[in-house]
Amino acid sequence: MSRFSEEQFIGFVLGVLSSICLKRGRNRVLIVDSTDVSLDLNWFRKKITKADLAGKEFKWGYSSSKGYYIGYKLTLAIEYPSLRPVAFLLHQGSPGDAKIYEEILEELKRRRIARNGDTIILDKGYYGYRNYVLGISRFKVISVIFPRKNFKMGKLMAMLSYPLSIFNRSNPEREKEFYRGLVKSLKAKLENWEEYKPIRSMIEDIFKLAKSAFSLKNLHRYTERSVKKFVCLHVLLVGIVVSLGINSKEELQRIAEW
């Protein structure tokens, strides 16, 4: 593994997963979520401050389920209903989901994973009117970000005007029709967002599988390069499991608890 760069290794793993799983269809659904990747530094025995981590490749982070930890934040994208992992990002510490939303979509587009018209399901951590708008206007995808209590549909619809780039295209009317279709679909899906909660919850079972069955819970790796490669291996193992047809909530939980 040491002979390959992180980018080469990630490309290799995602290429393997693509070859062993079913080919994608049109307008597919992706689920995106994040989890902590904790490094085993025994910080309970010896107090470690932020100053102690200056110059290190890992940072203090916070997870609502785990509390404070030292390590990274793993953001994973999986295809639904196959649950095949298709991309991941690793960040030091625990940056806010809404702040890295744009970077996530850039990565999905760069790797040609998210295509025009695809639907991406995300939890409330990614919430923000700007993020809904970016999904359609820049990335041409439908970002079903679970709304918060103060969400106003009218406010969002008022923000979704045609991007100026549409009028520079060879067929602006066709582009406008496609844009209207994205907006209409986003509105319908946000009005019924609770129907997507069981779908989004499947990625939690994927994380549980990776942590409990494949030991992603605590890594004995202390450089970002090494952590990325080992996360790649965990993603590959998860992909192999779901490629065997093990992709129901009950089956995934059974393996994770085995």
Task: Describe the predicted segments one by one.
Residues 2-124, 129-137:
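Polybasic low-complexity intrinsically disordered regions
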Residues 91-96, 146-152:
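Short, acidic/turn-prone active-site loops that include or flank metal/cofactor-
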Residues 99, 152-160:
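Short, charged, surface-exposed secondary-structure boundary motifs
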Residues 139-147:
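Short hydrophobic/aromatic-enriched beta-strand-loop microsegments
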Residues 163-224:
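Short amphipathic alpha-helical "interface-anchor" segments enriched in bulky aromatics
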Residues 199, 244, 258:
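Nucleic-acid-interacting cores, centered on viral/eukaryotic replication and modification enzymes
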Residues 216, 238-252:
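Short helix-capping/linker segments at secondary-structure and domain boundaries
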Residues 221-235:
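Membrane-interface transmembrane-helix boundary segments in multi-pass integral membrane proteins
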